[in-house]
């Protein structure tokens, strides 16, 4: 019999954005860079553009203001994400061999008998070149809750793909 989480806890977690420790650190570094480097540089660029006269026909000024809007929007977005982040350390997961957010899985594609290794991460961390797949991807959704030896069926553009779970790691 599977243990079920209380509904209130599930709802609370669902309001949070799951991030690995590394993913949260990357967002914090980007936020720090935007605030300490990019924001001051664009403020300086706007001040410089103002010295060039009529603002209504000043392309430099318009470009700098547009960039400022982008930077301020990204700062706001990062601050919001970090404020609602649920940071998960894969090394502290006790999922008894089940595939959960943050874990690394070794899979065998049953069609061509090749093995792949993925870490299941948040949307902002996903990078297929680095073998990090989003928790919201079709393959992750098919894998969550599976254990070693289980077979997951994934709806792919070319049809259904089957993957056998070879290993589940919490690293």
Feature-to-residue mapping (PLM):
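Short, intrinsically disordered, mixed-charge
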Residues: 33-36, 70, 80, 141-148
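Helix-rich terminal scaffold detector
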Residues: 1-72, 76
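Elongated periplasmic alpha-helical coiled-coil
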Residues: 50-52, 84-87
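Non-DNA-binding regulatory cores of transcription-related proteins
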Residues: 88-169
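Amphipathic alpha-helical coiled-coil segments
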Residues: 72-86
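Generic alpha-helical hydrophobic packing signal
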Residues: 28-30, 65-68, 81, 115, ...
């Amino acid at each position: 019999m599977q243990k079920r989480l209380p509904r209130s806890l599930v709802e609370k977690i669902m309001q949070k954005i799951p991030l690995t420790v590394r993913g949260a650190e990357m967002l914090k570094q980007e936020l720090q860079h935007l605030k300490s480097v990019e924001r001051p540089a664009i403020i300086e660029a706007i001040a410089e553009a103002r010295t060039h006269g009529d603002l209504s026909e000043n392309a430099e000024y318009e470009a700098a203001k547009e960039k400022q809007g982008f930077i301020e929007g990204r700062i706001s977005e990062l601050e919001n994400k970090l404020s609602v982040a649920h940071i998960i350390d894969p090394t502290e997961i006790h999922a008894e061999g089940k595939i959960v957010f943050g874990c690394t899985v070794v899979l065998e594609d049953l069609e061509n008998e090749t093995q792949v290794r993925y870490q299941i991460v948040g949307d902002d961390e996903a990078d297929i070149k680095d073998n990090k797949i989003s928790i919201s991807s079709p393959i992750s959704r098919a894998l969550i809750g599976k254990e070693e030896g289980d077979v997951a069926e994934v709806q792919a553009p070319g049809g259904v793909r089957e993957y056998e779970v070879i290993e589940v790691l919490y690293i």
